[in-house]
Amino acid sequence: LHDALPILFPAGRLDKTSTGFVLLTDDGALAHDILSPAHHVEKQYVVTLDTPLTDAMRRGFAAGVTLTDGETMAPAGVEPLTDDGLTVQVTLRQGVYHQIKRMFGVFDAGVNALHRESIGGVALDPALAPGQWRELTAAEVERLQNVK
C-alpha cells in the first residue's frame, strides 16, 4: 500500500503554535519553486500581537527588518486589520525560521497567534476545518505554476 501512495512534498511548514494553510504537492519542482527565495512567492498571514502595531513597525517591515542576529529580512508588508492594531496582516516574499515572530521581536512585540491565509495568491479554503484538506482546483494549480 505504501508504494501505491504518491510522494508528497511540503511547500513550506508551520511551527506547532501556528495554524493555517499548508500546501502539500506531488510535484517536487513546484514545491521547490514556491520555497525558493529567487521566486519571491507571496505568503499572507493574520497575526495577533500583544502590543499594537506602530508606525516604526510598519516602516521597519517596509524597509526590511534587521534581526537581533544581524540578518536583514527582505521588505515585507504589514497592515492593521483591527482598529486597535493588535490584529495585522503580514505579507512575506521570503521564508526564514520563525521570521514573523523574530521580526516583531525586534520591536519588542510578541506574537500571540499566527495563521497563514494564502500562498502564491491561493487562499486557504474557509470551508475547511483545522486538519481537513482538499485538492487544489485546476485554476489554483495554474496560478501556483505561474508564480515564477
Describe the role of every protein-language-model region.
Residues L1-K148:
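RNA pseudouridine synthases
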